[in-house]
Amino acid sequence: MEFRIAADELKKALHRAQGIVERKATMPILSNVLVTASKSGVTVAAFDLDIGIVSEHLAEVSKPGAITVSAKTLFDIVSFLPEAQVTVKKLPNNFAELTSGAAHYKLVGMAPEEFPRLPKDDAAHAVKVSGPTLLEMIKKTQFAISNDETRYILNGVFFEPREKGLVRMVATDGHRLALVERELSGDFKLKSGVIIPRKGLFELKRLLDEAPDADCQLGFAENSAIFKKPGLSMVMRLIDGQFPEYQRVIPKEGEKQLLVRRDKLFDALKRISLLSADKSNAVKLSLSENLLRITANNPDLGEAKDDLEVAYRGGTLTVGFNARYLIDVLGVLETDEVSVELGDEHSPGVLRPPGDRSFTAVVMPMRV
């Protein structure tokens, strides 16, 4: 095998693979990429047995073939090549040779036949979707995905087609919940919702971030999801299980509703939480007519408070929250103001854009 390719093009392919390959894999070959050269160009594949990606790139191929070498090592080398072009050649005993200008590398490889086969996506029914819309939905839910591996059902986002072309995405870690509903026209042919794993979702976000406006397709088979855009395809295994009945934890309507500038609340929470307890990030919200006071107390550091003007008429209330959870929600909203609904000190808080129920965030209270 031998081909010549633009270094930036090869770097792009290898960068896509970095989040998928296993750095400390029990199977060493899962730390590799499979580079295949044919008459139509070069493909670079990465697969960790759960998520696989294949990207296609133009190249001058003088001899077809395949190699598999360390993804990280190859990426690091290509990132610092002295010339705009690089020649890749397969040597005996699965070694790979890279040449760019006066720079020359000889890398240890493995037999390409040992690289695991990626699942075929023939059974997946792919639907053309809006890249910007899908990217927005991921950004507005990913922060609430659980990192607790013992609660594997919550280690992903729930993708649920609704009526009239609407799709709902929901994530929760048991302490907070994020829900967003948008129009993604097309029939995904799903009998019920599916759970997209956290790692797969983050890789999907990275691919969408490359070119949000590019045409893309999303589809599902029995236990896998497929994402495609020009020159690239990604397949991932879905989480097998039943997502919790999330509707039950969303309060119908809070007794106390206030309107506050999003940026003011965001900045105040960041300032005051500097003196909150390290692990809990606890802050206290005290609500009275047209006033919201935010306080934090740390026996080792001291205390802090800040007052914000809000649109509110009603009784007083004091309730505690994890400041980090509130900050995460405010950070994904674009509106100038945010609506906050509260019940009592034991009830969850609900945050939404004013007059818009297509996004809902629920944050559980805490003792402070």
Task: Please state what every model-predicted region is.
Residues 1-368:
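Structural preference for solvent-exposed beta-strand-turn elements
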